[in-house]
Each structure stands twice: as structure tokens, then as C-alpha cells.
């Protein structure tokens, strides 16, 4: 017995309309108003759009207001007029946002990578990792080449005398980081394999130098020490290997995998709460950094060409090169994808930290762009560690800039050395503010350029580093989108799934017997439609 379809009335009840497949669809009041051309439907559309993009709009407005507020306070006397106590209170909301984000970096990175590595079968893990590293390597090389080309074309360091005279006191040459190239790469290898996982959560290994008197001769001796700063590279490597080990345990590792997945989900709930505070923190972070600068106008006047070269390179790579790569492989609109991650991009600009932006980026690519959790939570932490397109581009521009300041010519061999060294050193660049400047000394030493001029780079790094971070996290997100597209196409072509996600929604009672239906460590071979899967059609992936 078929019931009569509901009929619309003047009180706003939905009316039934036939669909193409013979069914009935309910037309809402908004749809009826839009069909009639009334203004009510337009207002409702605008209201829904504002509600859906409220956080994005608030974040963009926060950046604009932060710049205006910072320039206004700077024009009224800046940090000197405020005094130390008022300045500390002025930047406190931004400091609070950084502390909230850094608080959840460690559990988020470790739990997401363990859960992600454990939810992929070994073959898919290797393929996804290889494609991700290839994408990161190619885009970093393209960014480095673009940086060198722009610096050679625009000649930002041509007016060396004026820049040295005006900004020479902005930093101290003695404080510039000086490290041998070999020791830098050895430190990178040491940090990949930390000797203590607990200390790796807040310290990393770094080589320093001290002069010793050996047989009447002053010799520079390398001395290893632990320095402040999370060794995120070592934690990433350990988490991936530990996740693979849990997968190898089979049913015995399911309970621990579910624990890490649940821990990760709880962390993402915290992220969703922090996101609504992000606009306030970003506004005061941007404003506070502008207020702390002594003379913003002078720096822009003297180093404007260098700043323009860096920002132009980041804009070209982020708005043209990366979207073009995404479009060529996915045939989808890349700018629609970028619109879904506007909030993390603005957060990256405000915090100047790829690691601090990681929680927001995970949530946005999953909810707004449809990237699967086991992909985003596996790829994005790796990208935040090894993918530094913005840093590589900035380092190449800075190296050519310093060469022009020093009036040293760059031949073909030196240019290739800059490209290769910038790409390699950016892999180990920490996802923290000013991380790129710390590795710039490696490039300068590789091509025998003076390290003293790094003080000029530090004078404007507060702005360039923010642009670098935006480009870095954009590359991470687009890489996750590309891998999601690759997985979708591969699963359609193959007769068996490549990715087997561990079901974290199972009840957390004592470890049950490995039943056939809910065991995520078994591959199910689908037969013809309607046929039941028998035990002989299942094969363990272990």
C-alpha cells in the first residue's frame, strides 16, 4: 500500500516533486522561494554561505585587522611607547594561540603517524610513501630553480653599498650560525635516530664548535650537544616504524592501534575547539610582530627588492606552479581545494610554523576537501617535516642576494650547488619560526659566500618566513590531495583494496577473538554481486 505524497500548503510544508528515477523529492521552502525568484531565497543562500565559511572569513579579517592594528600602534610610537609590560600584554593573545597549538603537536604527530602507518598494508605504505617523497622532492627542486631564476633576473642585491650602510646594524655577524656542511648532514642523520625518545620530544642534537689549544695550535673542535627544540624528524621516523610493527603483530596489535586512533580523535576534538580561538590569536600575532619592528618603512625601502623577489616567487609557486601540478594529475579545480584550507594558510601566516599549523590542516583537508583520515594523518606530518618549498625558494634567493652584495659571480657549478644544497638542507629544516635561516648557512658555506650577511636576512625574516610557511603547508595539503586522487583511481582499477583502515569505532572491551567479519587485517576478495564471501576467499595480509 503506497501512501499519498505530502502536499505543500500555505504554512510552509514541503511539497513533493517527481524525480528522474520515478521517486519523490521534497522541495524545501528555500527551493520554492528560489524558483519563484523571491529575495528570501537569496538571503537564505547568503546566510548559509556565511555560516559555512564563517571561520575562514574571521581568519582573513583577523589578518587584515592585525596588520592595520600593528601599523597603527607602530605609528603611535611602537614598542617604545607601549613599554615592556604593555607590549607583553599586547602580544599575549597570540602567544596563547602558539602555546595551545604546540601543546598538541606531539600527541597529534605520534598518534596520527602510528595509526596511519598501521592502517595501511605494507605494499600501499611503500607506494604512498614513495609517491609522497617524489612529489615533495620535485616541488622543492622547482621552488629552488624558481628562486634562483628570479634572483638572477631582478638583481635584488645590486645596490650593495646602500643596503650595507643602512641595515648593517640590524643584526650581529658574530651571532650568525656557522656550521660545516658535513656536520650539518651528520646532525640530520643523528636526529633521524634519536638515542632517547623522551628527550626527542623537546630536544634535538646539534654540533657546535669550540677552539682548543692542541700542541700550541688553536684548533676548532666539533662538540655535540642537545639544544632546545622538538626533534620532530626522529619522532616521525619512530612513529612510522612503530606503526608498521603494530601491523605486523596482527590481532595482538589491534587493541593498541585502536588506542592510538582514539587518542588521535580526541586530539582532533581539541583542535576543533582551538580553531575558533585562532582568529583572535592570529590578529595579535601579526600586530605584535609589526609593533616589535623598529622602523618597518626603512627596512622596506632598503630591502624592498629582496622582499619583493621572495614574495613574488612564493606567489608564483603557490598560485601557479603547485595548482598546475594538482590540475594536471587530478583534472580538478585546485583553487576550490585551496579555498578549503584558507584557515590553515592564514594560521601559517600568523604563527610562522608548519608544525603549529598541522592540527588545523589535518581537520580542514579531511572535512572540506574529502581527504581520507589514514592518508592525511600519514602524509601531512611527513610533509611538515621534509617538504619545505618556501624555505628552499627563500634560501636560493638569499644566496644569490648575498652573492650580489659581495660582488661575487656565480658560475653554472655554483648555481647547481645552490639548487642541490637548498633542496637537501630544506629537508631537515625544523618546522619552527626562522628554521630556514638556520640552514641558510649551509648553502653559503657550500659555495664559499660570506656568512656575515645573514644579519641582513634576519632583519626582514619576520615577513619572509611567514610567506615561506604558507607555501610549505600549501604544498603539504596539495600533496595529500594528489595522493587521495591516486588512491581513488587505483582502487577503482584494482579488484582488491590497497588500503585497509583499522576500524577504531569498535568497542574498547578486552581483545575479542578474531572473528571473520570485523577483522581489519584480512583482505576480502569480492566475488560476483550477491555471492557470500566464504572463508577460503580471505587471505591474511600478514
Swiss-Prot record:
Protein's membrane topology: Multi-pass membrane protein
Glycosylation site list: 164, 213
Disordered: annotated segments: 509-542
Keyword Transmembrane: yes
Keywords for the protein's UniProt record, in alphabetical order: Acetylation, Amino-acid transport, Antiport, Cell membrane, Glycoprotein, Membrane, Metal-binding, Phosphoprotein, Sodium, Symport, Transmembrane, Transmembrane helix, Transport
BP GO terms, sorted: glutamine transport; L-aspartate import across plasma membrane; protein homotrimerization
Residue(s) carrying Phosphothreonine: 495
Location of this chain's protein in the cell: Cell membrane; Melanosome
Chain ranges on the Cytoplasmic side, renumbered to this chain: 1-52, 118-131, 250-258, 330-334, 366-374, 484-542
TM region(s), chain numbering: 53-82, 96-117, 132-154, 226-249, 259-286, 308-329, 375-401, 462-483
Modified residues (Phosphoserine): 494, 504, 536, 540
Catalysed reactions, as listed in the record: L-glutamine(out) + L-serine(in) + Na(+)(out) = L-glutamine(in) + L-serine(out) + Na(+)(in); L-glutamine(in) + L-serine(out) + Na(+)(out) = L-glutamine(out) + L-serine(in) + Na(+)(in); L-threonine(in) + L-glutamine(out) + Na(+)(out) = L-threonine(out) + L-glutamine(in) + Na(+)(in); L-threonine(out) + L-glutamine(in) + Na(+)(out) = L-threonine(in) + L-glutamine(out) + Na(+)(in)
Residues involved in Na(+) 1 binding: 383, 387, 472, 476
Chain ranges inside the bilayer that never cross it: 335-365, 415-448
Family: Belongs to the dicarboxylate/amino acid:cation symporter (DAACS) (TC 2.A.23) family. SLC1A5 subfamily.
Function: Sodium-coupled antiporter of neutral amino acids. In a tri-substrate transport cycle, exchanges neutral amino acids between the extracellular and intracellular compartments, coupled to the inward cotransport of at least one sodium ion. The preferred substrate is the essential amino acid L-glutamine, a precursor for biosynthesis of proteins, nucleotides and amine sugars as well as an alternative fuel for mitochondrial oxidative phosphorylation. Exchanges L-glutamine with other neutral amino acids such as L-serine, L-threonine and L-asparagine in a bidirectional way.
The protein's name: Neutral amino acid transporter B(0)
Lineage: Eukaryota, Metazoa, Chordata, Craniata, Vertebrata
Amino acid at each position: 500500500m503506497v501512501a499519498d505524497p505530502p502536499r505543500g500548503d500555505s504554512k510552509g510544508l514541503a511539497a513533493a516533486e517527481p524525480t528522474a528515477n520515478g521517486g519523490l523529492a521534497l522541495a524545501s521552502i528555500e527551493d520554492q522561494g528560489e524558483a519563484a525568484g523571491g529575495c528570501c531565497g537569496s538571503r537564505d543562500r547568503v546566510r548559509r554561505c556565511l555560516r559555512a565559511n564563517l571561520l575562514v572569513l574571521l581568519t582573513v579579517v583577523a589578518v587584515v585587522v592585525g596588520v592595520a592594528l600593528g601599523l597603527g600602534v607602530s605609528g603611535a610610537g611602537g614598542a617604545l611607547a607601549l613599554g615592556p609590560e604593555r607590549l607583553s600584554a599586547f602580544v599575549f593573545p597570540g602567544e596563547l594561540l602558539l602555546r595551545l597549538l604546540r601543546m598538541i603537536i606531539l600527541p597529534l604527530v605520534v598518534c596520527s603517524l602510528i595509526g596511519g602507518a598501521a592502517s595501511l598494508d605494507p605494499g600501499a605504505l611503500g607506494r604512498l610513501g614513495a609517491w609522497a617523497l617524489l612529489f615533495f622532492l620535485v616541488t622543492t627542486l622547482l621552488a629552488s630553480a624558481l628562486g634562483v631564476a628570479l634572483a638572477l633576473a631582478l638583481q635584488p642585491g645590486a645596490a650593495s653599498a646602500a643596503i650595507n650602510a643602512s641595515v648593517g646594524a640590524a643584526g650581529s655577524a658574530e651571532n650568525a650560525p656557522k656550521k660545516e656542511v658535513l656536520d650539518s648532514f651528520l646532525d640530520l642523520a643523528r636526529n633521524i635516530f634519536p638515542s632517547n625518545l623522551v628527550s626527542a620530544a623537546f630536544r634535538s642534537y646539534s654540533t657546535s664548535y669550540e677552539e682548543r689549544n692542541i700542541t700550541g695550535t688553536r684548533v676548532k673542535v666539533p662538540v655535540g650537544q642537545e639544544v632546545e627544540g622538538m626533534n620532530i624528524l626522529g619522532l616521525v621516523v619512530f612513529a612510522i616504524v612503530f606503526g608498521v610493527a603494530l601491523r605486523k603483530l596482527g590481532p595482538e596489535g589491534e587493541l593498541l592501534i585502536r588506542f592510538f586512533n582514539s587518542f588521535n580523535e580526541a586530539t582532533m576534538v581539541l583542535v576543533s575547539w582551538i580553531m575558533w580561538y585562532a582568529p583572535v590569536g592570529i590578529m595579535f600575532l601579526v600586530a605584535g610582530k609589526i609593533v616589535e619592528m623598529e622602523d618597518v618603512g626603512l627596512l622596506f625601502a632598503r630591502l624592498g627588492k629582496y622582499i619583493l623577489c621572495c614574495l613574488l616567487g612564493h606567489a608564483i609557486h603557490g598560485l601557479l606552479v603547485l595548482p598546475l601540478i594538482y590540475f594536471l594529475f587530478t583534472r580538478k579545480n585546485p583553487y576550490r581545494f585551496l579555498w578549503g584550507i584558507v584557515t590553515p594558510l592564514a594560521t601559517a601566516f600568523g604563527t610562522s610554523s608548519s608544525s603549529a599549523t598541522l592540527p588545523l590542516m589535518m581537520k580542514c583537508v579531511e572535512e572540506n576537501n574529502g581527504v581520507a583520515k589514514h592518508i592525511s594523518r600519514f602524509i601531512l606530518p611527513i610533509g611538515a617535516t621534509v617538504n619545505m618549498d618556501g624555505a628552499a625558494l627563500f634560501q636560493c634567493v638569499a644566496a644569490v642576494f648575498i652573492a650580489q652584495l659581495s660582488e661575487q659571480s656565480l658560475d653554472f657549478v655554483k648555481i647547481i650547488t645552490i639548487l642541490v644544497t637548498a633542496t637537501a638542507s630544506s629537508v631537515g629544516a625544523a618546522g619552527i619560526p626562522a628554521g630556514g635561516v638556520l640552514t641558510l648557512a649551509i648553502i653559503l658555506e657550500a659555495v664559499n659566500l660570506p656568512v656575515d650577511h645573514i644579519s641582513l636576512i634576519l632583519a626582514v625574516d619576520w615577513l619572509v618566513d611567514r610567506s615561506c610557511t604558507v607555501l610549505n603547508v600549501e604544498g603539504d595539503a596539495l600533496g595529500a590531495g594528489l595522493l587521495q586522487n591516486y588512491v581513488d583511481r587505483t582502487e577503482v582499477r584494482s579488484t582488491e583494496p590497497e588500503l585497509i583502515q583499522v576500524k577504531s569505532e569498535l568497542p574498547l572491551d578486552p581483545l575479542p577473538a578474531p572473528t571473520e567479519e570485523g577483522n581489519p587485517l584480512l583482505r576480502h576478495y569480492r566475488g560476483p554481486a550477491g555471492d557470500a564471501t566464504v572463508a577460503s576467499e580471505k587471505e591474511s595480509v600478514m
